[in-house]
């Protein structure tokens, strides 16, 4: 792996380096060309952002600048906040998948901003979102345990149900907006 992982956070996460390597193994190596490091810190240290944005921003991509290669920052205090046991249990259980989503989104930003041609700035967000969904699906199938293997035969029906519920939700929102006017 040619992406360096630096941990500069007071939050200790078990097997963080190994998890990052497994996540990056899903992505083709050509997409990581020029992406030098991922820094894990407590908060994103960007002076141009307000304190409120820094406290809630999970990650930030720094594109290639003069004399500096592309790199990324991940805020572990946003992904795994220090709370009492019952509140932090859910965030700890979903930390691996949240970490995968964040890292894949950073790689997608790097790929579409530096390596991919033909993507306009107004198409960047949708392209990154589809990239993350595609690679996250591959990661989940590779890393998923018993639950993923048990639910795989039912996935088409569950996806169909999710689409149907999403359309009903949109119709309901449209009806509410029309009734407000």
Task: Show where each model-derived region lies.
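Active-site recognition of the HExxH zinc-binding catalytic motif
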Residues: 97-114
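Short helix/strand-bridging catalytic loops that position acidic/His residues to coordinate divalent metals
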Residues: 90, 113-122
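Hydrophobic (often cysteine-bearing) scaffold residues that line and stabilize catalytic clefts
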Residues: 16, 96, 100, 124
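Long, well-structured alpha-helical subdomains associated
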Residues: 2-4, 14, 137-181
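An active-site-proximal "capping" alpha-helix that borders the catalytic cofactor pocket
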Residues: 122-138
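Helix-hairpin-helix/helix-loop-helix acidic hairpins
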Residues: 82-89
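A metal-dependent hydrolase signature that marks the N-terminal structural subdomain at the beginning
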Residues: 1-73, 90, 169-181
